[in-house]
Every structure is written in structure tokens, then in C-alpha cells.
Amino acid sequence: MQPAEFWKKDKIILYFFSALKYNPIINRKRKGTMIMKKWMAFLLAAAMVCMLFTGCGKSSGTDSDLAYVQDKGVLVVGITEYAPMDYRDENGQWTGFDAEFAQLFAEKLGVKCEFYLIADWTKKFVELDTKQIDVVWNGMTICDDALSNSSVSDPYVINAQVVVMKADAVGNYKTPESLSGLSVAVENGSVGQTAANAIAGAKVIPVGDQAAALLEVKSGAADACVIDITMAYAMTGEGTNYGDLAPGLKLTEEFYGVSFRKGSDMTAMLNEFMAELKENGTLQDMADRYKLTLAE
């Protein structure tokens, strides 16, 4: 509804109430009748307001999430620091498999790609629903929480939750039961946290993100961490900042997906675009560069 239109309708309502209040016929009725008339007036006014503003609760025929993004000219992509999916290069620019994928999709839509750092991963769907971001594109595991709170794309990368600890200790822990009594760092609200919670006797330590979970192990504040296997192999071992750490026991297998708002028409568009990139080999080339395994 346009502001001018709202003002006109607001003026009609005020006039209506004024007429009811000062109508001499109503004013000379008995007290009991006056009360009844006031209630009738209230109900009539309420009905009038409903009729006047029926159109306010309806869309103007542009419920399309795609149209919303194209109108503003930018796709805001929610991410965290998570190599090799999303991370900053030496120039401070966002790069990684997901960052490149998101930029290609933004080009397909004819809009700019803007990255937004999700400070609290547990609030990602709140950020999505309130339109702080348009999509969660950050190595997100397809799980019940994601399926309930968003529109999830087809799976595109195979992942697993893996236990990372000091390299010289990895061989001593080959079953979940063997981890009992250990302190295990996890990203708060992550699938890794769910996997760690299932380890009987483990002390689970929630932290801000997966990089922070690795740091807990490196510093000795935790015995182990549970993170995505994609990150574990990219961030640990010789030549990395975590050369003394290594991935060991695999706890779960899963798939990554991209989350849009519930009912978004961009989900189907991304699925079609993803199929094109798989067919022409673009997605496989990217997966090879980042040492990832594409979902079938």
C-alpha cells in the first residue's frame, strides 16, 4: 500500500469514528442503548479496518525470492571461516569452493555477490528469515534442522564428521567408545556437536566455529575436536598451521547442501544451474582443486 493511499484510508476511519461520537441521534439514546451502540460502532469500525487493509497482508504478486534478489541487485551469502569452502586469501578476499560456486550463481542471476560473516552459526536461519542474508552457503550439512527451517538444494559435496587430535595419539583411538573421558571441542550448533554428544563419557566443549575447535586441540585446551573431514584434511598436517594435528576416527557420513528461505524459487534455479556445472565439468574442476568429492 502506498503512503498516500494509507493516509486517505486512515482519514476515512477517523471521520467514521468522529461521526459515531457526535451523531445527535445516538447521543440522545438511553444509557443502555448507548453502550450497545458503542459496541456496534466498535465492531463496524473493526470490520471497516479489515476491509480497508485486506490488501496490506497480501503480496503484490512478487513473492518471488529471485525477483527480490534481482531487484536489489545483490545476493547476500551467509558464510563462516571454513576452509576449503569459505576462507580469506592473502588479500583478505573471500575464496574457497563455496565462495566460487556462489559467485558463479550470482553471475547467473545477473547480480553482485556479497559475503556476510555469520557470527553465530545457531542463528543462521534467523539471519535467513529476516533477510539479513539470502542464502546459507557454507559447507552446510543437510540435516533435519536445515530441512525444517529452510529450502535446501540438492546435495553437492560428500562430507563426514571426523575426530582430529594430536598426530601421535590418533592411532590410539579407533572406536567411539575409546574416546570416553576425553574433552572434545566442537562448533556450537553444528552436526559435529551432535556427533560428539553421541560419544558416551566425552566432555563436549562448544566453541564459536570449527577453526576455534582446532585451536582448542592445538593449544591443549581440548584432547580432540570433531569437525568436517573436508576442513580436517585442508587445515591439518605438514605445511599447515596445525602440522601436529591429524584426522582419525570417522563418526558420520553426510552431504552438503545450500539453504534458501522456505518456499524460495531460487532453490530450483540453483539445482538446474548445479546440473549444468556438473555436466560441463566446471564443478568437478573446482572439486579437484579443493580436494573435495562431489555428490552423485
Task: Enumerate the language-model features and the residues they cover.
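Short, low-complexity disordered leader/linker segments with a strong preference
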Residues: 1-72, 295-296
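Ligand-binding clefts/hinges and TM-proximal coupling segments of bilobed small-molecule sensing domains
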Residues: 58-63, 191-208, 243-250, 272-296
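Extracytoplasmic small-molecule ligand-binding "clamshell" domains
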Residues: 60-139
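Short helix-initiation/N-cap motifs at beta->coil->alpha
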Residues: 63, 115-126, 171, 188-191, ...
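Bilobed "Venus flytrap"/periplasmic-binding protein-like clamshell domains
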Residues: 76, 81-84, 94-108, 159-214, ...
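Acidic, polar ligand-binding/catalytic clefts
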Residues: 103, 107, 112-178, 244, ...
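A ligand-binding cleft/hinge motif common to bilobed small-molecule-binding domains
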Residues: 140-148, 195-198, 218-219, 223-252
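Periplasmic-binding protein-like
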Residues: 158-165, 229, 233-275, 293-296
